[in-house]
Regions:
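Short, solvent-exposed coil/turn segments at beta-strand boundaries
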Residues: 4-6, 33-36, 77-80
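Short, cysteine-centered beta-strand-loop-beta hairpins and adjacent loop/turn segments enriched
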Residues: 17-23, 48-55
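Short beta-strand-centered aromatic/proline hotspots
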Residues: 25-34
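Short, solvent-exposed secondary-structure boundary/capping segments
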Residues: 37-46
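Intrinsically disordered, low-complexity, charged/polar segments
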Residues: 49-104
């Protein structure tokens, strides 16, 4: 929980299960609030139609990061706010907490 700060954007690398590197994408989250046992976020809307191709490890991340920053400044987030509880080993929550990193 300590690594998450309210107001910062974090990314989480997510595979689509197709078995190719090109299918690995990044989800972006704005942390909106947090409690002792949970964090709340809004997901930044990122679509292949906007960027022309799926975001993957081989993509120009700096260029994409600027696009995310621009969109985040004008507030393009999904309306719904999500939360995740304290991680437990072996759960999806554990994976989220282990691999989510701040966008710098």
């Amino acid at each position: 929980m300590e690594k998450f700060e309210v107001g910062k954007i974090y990314s989480y690398k997510k595979g689509s299960g197709c078995g190719y590197d090109e299918c690995i994408s990044y989800n972006y989250y704005l942390i909106t609030r947090k409690t002792e046992k949970s964090i709340w976020w809004k997901k930044i809307s990122v679509s292949v139609e906007v960027y022309g191709k799926a975001v993957n490890e081989k993509a120009d991340f700096k260029k994409f990061e600027k696009a995310v920053e621009k969109r985040s400044k004008i507030g393009i987030y999904e309306d719904e706010e999500y939360f995740i509880d304290t991680p437990e080993f072996g759960s999806q929550n554990y994976i989220f907490f282990k691999y989510t990193k701040e966008v710098k």
